[in-house]
Amino acid sequence: MNTMNSVLKYKELALYGGSFDPLHKAHLAIIEQTLELLPSAKLIVLPAYQNPFKKPCFLDAQTRFKELERALKGIDRVLLSDFEIKQERAVPTIESVLHFQKLYHPQTLYLVIGADCLRHLSSWTNAKELLKRVELVVFERIGYEEIQFKGHYHPLKGIDAPISSSAIRASLGV
């Protein structure tokens, strides 16, 4: 994992946000495959303080951040950011995109999302503006293979980890 200053040399950035509640092997597979798909990009992993589309998190923000910090240690081209956690509220994706564009001025900014997010992307805050500012990298999710999206995106296929944080929480009875 790298420092914020190491981001400046990259012309391409990718943002991968999420609750990571809890972190699991599919998250790590997405990170690995994003780095392979975008060999010239720096990947910023952005845990949410609170996902605006989900119930309050099971694990607190600092615990989730520390889990990510341990898991990402030593992975080149990955930066873990606490930008959204420091806001102590649900942060719309467009706000994070604007923050990182202003901070680093990348030529290309990718947004890594799951296929399930395409279904309700139009309901996100300033969705049209968001889609003008980013290129989407979309990873497959079981049950969302046939989603229709009228726009360009880079597919991230073959995430061979049919696990979701929701399923893990459900198995724990929370």
Curated annotation (Swiss-Prot):
GO molecular function, one term: nicotinate-nucleotide adenylyltransferase activity
Family, similarity comment: Belongs to the NadD family.
Role, per record: Catalyzes the reversible adenylation of nicotinate mononucleotide (NaMN) to nicotinic acid adenine dinucleotide (NaAD).
InterPro entries, A to Z: Cyt_trans-like, NadD/NMNAT, Rossmann-like_a/b/a_fold
Lineage of the organism: Bacteria, Pseudomonadati, Campylobacterota, Epsilonproteobacteria, Campylobacterales
Pfam families for the chain: CTP_transf_like
Gene that specifies this protein: nadD
UniProt record, GO biological process: NAD biosynthetic process
Keyword field: ATP-binding, NAD, Nucleotide-binding, Nucleotidyltransferase, Pyridine nucleotide biosynthesis, Transferase
Name under which the protein is recorded: Probable nicotinate-nucleotide adenylyltransferase
Domain of life: Bacteria
This protein's pathway: Cofactor biosynthesis; NAD(+) biosynthesis; deamido-NAD(+) from nicotinate D-ribonucleotide: step 1/1
The enzyme's E.C. designation: 2.7.7.18
Reaction equations catalysed: nicotinate beta-D-ribonucleotide + ATP + H(+) = deamido-NAD(+) + diphosphate
